[in-house]
Design a protein with these regions (language model features):
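Extended ligand-binding regions for polar small-molecule ligands
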Residues: 31-36, 77-86, 148, 152, ...
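Ligand-binding cleft/hinge of the Venus flytrap
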Residues: 65-69, 80-89, 167-186, 217
Length: 251
């Protein structure tokens, strides 16, 4: 009997402590979110009434501009809209490329960059970057009749990469580790790289596999083999760290 009373007392006490802990935790989270919402970086956008977001316009499924509908579409476009909705402001999509996205953050043209931006230590040293919202790996798009079926088949061949992207550095690191040699052609956009592949100016077009999927056709294939995990993050200038912290709460 005494044991049952003690057990009942301990159960009630445990539940009471757990309830207090949960209430305290929810209160802390709410206070943190309120603090971020009222931060200078976030309130600047709220008062303006518009969130300026840099997005890609040539990456199907992520950031793509449709001339037919005159709209932007893709998961990154949707993510930008979600953040704007949370802030109760309009969203203004600003097209970026791998070459222009960082300068547009530097000069304040865009508040956030949501454009297949790979997280790495060098970028984290220069920009405020969110937690990852997407994971991928680097891949290769080749012509089906090229005879190229694995990465080692590209030894001594020419690979097309995007200017300003981290792909070339990753390929150089991979080649060095696997005793391979690649030649490189750097172009300004993904459509240009796809055209170069069809024109046989490059033997492969290399970037993250999810991006390559938007350029696959009856004549091309993405190699099953890939390498180096890529993490995409939302980025902004260092002065907008509170804005990035706010987006982390939404991811």
């Amino acid at each position: 009997m005494i044991f049952k009373k003690i057990l009942r007392y301990l159960t009630v006490a445990t539940l009471a402590i757990a309830t207090v802990f949960l209430i305290s935790s929810h209160k802390t989270v709410a206070e943190d979110k309120s603090k971020l919402l009222n931060s200078k970086a976030v309130q600047k956008i709220v008062k303006r009434g518009t969130l300026n977001v840099g997005v890609k316009q040539d990456v199907p499924n992520f950031g793509y501009y449709s001339a037919k509908t005159n709209t932007y579409e893709g998961m990154e476009v949707d993510l930008a809209k979600k953040i704007a909705d949370e802030l109760k402001v309009k969203v203004n999509y600003i097209p970026v490329t791998t070459q222009t996205r960082e300068p547009l953050m530097d000069n304040g043209t865009i508040d956030l960059l949501i454009g297949t931006y790979t997280i790495n230590d060098e970028r984290k040293a220069s920009y405020a970057i969110s937690n990852p919202y997407y994971y991928d790996q680097i891949g290769f798009l080749v012509l089906k009749d090229s005879g190229i079926n694995k990465i080692s088949d590209l030894n001594g061949k020419t690979i097309g990469v995007s200017q300003g992207a981290s792909t070339k550095a990753a390929l150089q690191e991979y080649a060095s580790a696997h005793n391979l040699k690649f030649n490189y052609v750097q172009l300004g956009s993904f459509p240009e790289l796809a055209v170069s592949l069809y024109a046989h100016r490059v033997n492969a077009f290399s970037v993250d596999k999810s991006i390559l999927s938007g350029y696959e056709s009856k004549k091309t294939k993405t190699l099953k083999e890939g390498f180096k995990t890529q993490e995409y993050g939302i980025a902004s200038s260092k002065s907008n760290q509170d804005l990035i912290d706010y987006t982390n709460d939404l991811l």
